[in-house]
Every structure is written in C-alpha cells, then in structure tokens.
Amino acid sequence: MSDWNPSLYLHFSAERSRPAVELLARVPLENVEYVADLGCGPDNSTALLQQRWPAARITGIDSSPAMIAEARSALPDCQFVEADIRNWQPVQALDLIFANASLQWLPDHYELFPHLVSLLNPQGVLAVQMPDNWLEPTHVLMREVAWEQNYPDRGREPLAGVHAYYDILSEAGCEVDIWRTTYYHQMPSHQAIIDWVTATGLRPWLQDLTESEQQLFLKRYHQMLEEQYPLQENGQILLAFPRLFIVARRME
C-alpha cells in the first residue's frame, strides 16, 4: 500500500465529490486565470474547477504517482504535477488555491496556511475542505486496534479547530468564512465502511503491515465497527462524517 489506489478512492466518488461541489459553490470569484488544486487526486475536484472556469490555467498537485497518472488521462487540458504540497511553488501568483480533503494529511498548519495565503494574488481565495473525523468511531477504533495489536500510532493529527483556523487566516490578512458540516452517508454494510476508509484514513495504519497482519487488523476493526454502528430499520448504516470548510480571501 505504498501508493494511493485511484480505483478504490473513486468507489465512493459521489460521496467524496459532494463536499468539493459545496466548497466550490462558496468561492466568491468570477474571473479566474490561475488555479491550483492541491491534493487533486484522480481528477474529481479538478474537473469541477475546469467546468466552472474553462479558460483558467489549472494545475493539479498530488504526491501520488498513481493519482497524477489517472488525472492526466482524464483531463489532458490541465497541467498535473507530482509534488509535495509544502514544497511546490507556482510560477505566478494564484487567483484560487483549492484544497479538497488534502491538507489534513500535512503537519504544521500554523505555518502551512499563511504560506498558502502568500501564494495568492490580492483578492485571491484559499478554499479548503478537511475531514474533521478524528474523534469519530471510524478513526478512534483505528487507534484502539493498533494499541491492542501493539502497532505504533500512524494516524494523522487532529485538526487545529475552528477558532484556531480563523485566527491563523485572519492574522495572515484574510477575510474568513468558516463552517462545519456533518454528512450522514448511507452504507450497505460494515464492510462498506472499511472499503471507504481503506482508501484514505486506514492507509497509514496498514501500509507497513504484512498481509496476515492486515487481515488480523481488519478483522478486529470490523468487529468493533459492528459494536459502534447499529443497523437502521432498513438494514442500512448511517456513517456520520464531519467536515470543516474554509474560504479565506486575501485582502492585501
């Protein structure tokens, strides 16, 4: 599991794309020339940007070779760069930086967010959506299974929080719009929840395990999910998925 799996990631493409659609709807820009899609993945968010601003010069950034290859195949008119978001530098200042479900993987948001703002033109926008599910059972149970089976903690850190992001971006000279939404995704089974998180949140936990260790981890994780997520009357499972949204406009 050394690289991301685009096919597995896109298995829930509608659910993963919906927050990007809702984030994009809140971006207060009409004329956009230069756009960066940070953590672009296999193209789902970049395609939305291209649909809204077909004449814009859009660059997708991702550290995954597999994701970049998939995106290049799907959107040949856009530029895609394999790079670490923290180190990538645009050729020119940007009108929009769009980051859908990517920045939560990176540390030091107190430094990262002001750095991203510095890459914007005056009146440019940083639009961010991040899963805020560190305290949800899906992610708490990952840590509990790892503790039970004597594996090191490999999960991501919790987000800084609404008030912290507001202060970080306000101090960076931005007008900030910030909100939090909880989605309730209908899952047909507990295995479907595992399929969802295997493409994202579970990756760090599983990637260094042997195949047999992965099977033991997932078996125990499945058992715990059954205890935490009851079936609805129709047999479905409601998976609560909180997400944090930020639209910050550089006012300098």
From Swiss-Prot:
Q: Which domain of life is it from?
A: Bacteria
Which molecular function terms from Gene Ontology are attached? trans-aconitate 2-methyltransferase activity
Recorded E.C. number(s)? 2.1.1.144
Please give the SUPFAM superfamilies that the UniProt record associates with this protein: S-adenosyl-L-methionine-dependent methyltransferases
Q: Name one GO cellular component term.
A: cytoplasm
This chain's protein is named Trans-aconitate 2-methyltransferase
Family per similarity comment: Belongs to the methyltransferase superfamily. Tam family.
Coiled coil stretches, renumbered = none
This molecule's function is given as:
Catalyzes the S-adenosylmethionine monomethyl esterification of trans-aconitate.
Give the UniProt subcellular location, in the record's own words: Cytoplasm
**Entry keyword set:** Cytoplasm, Methyltransferase, S-adenosyl-L-methionine, Transferase
| Gene Ontology biological process | methylation
Mention any Pfam family matching this sequence: Methyltransf_25
| Species of provenance | Escherichia coli O9:H4 (strain HS)
The family database entries (InterPro entries) matched by this protein are listed as: Methyltransf_25, SAM-dependent_MTases_sf, Trans-aconitate_MeTrfase, Trans_acon_MeTrfase_C
What catalytic reaction does the record list? trans-aconitate + S-adenosyl-L-methionine = (E)-3-(methoxycarbonyl)pent-2-enedioate + S-adenosyl-L-homocysteine
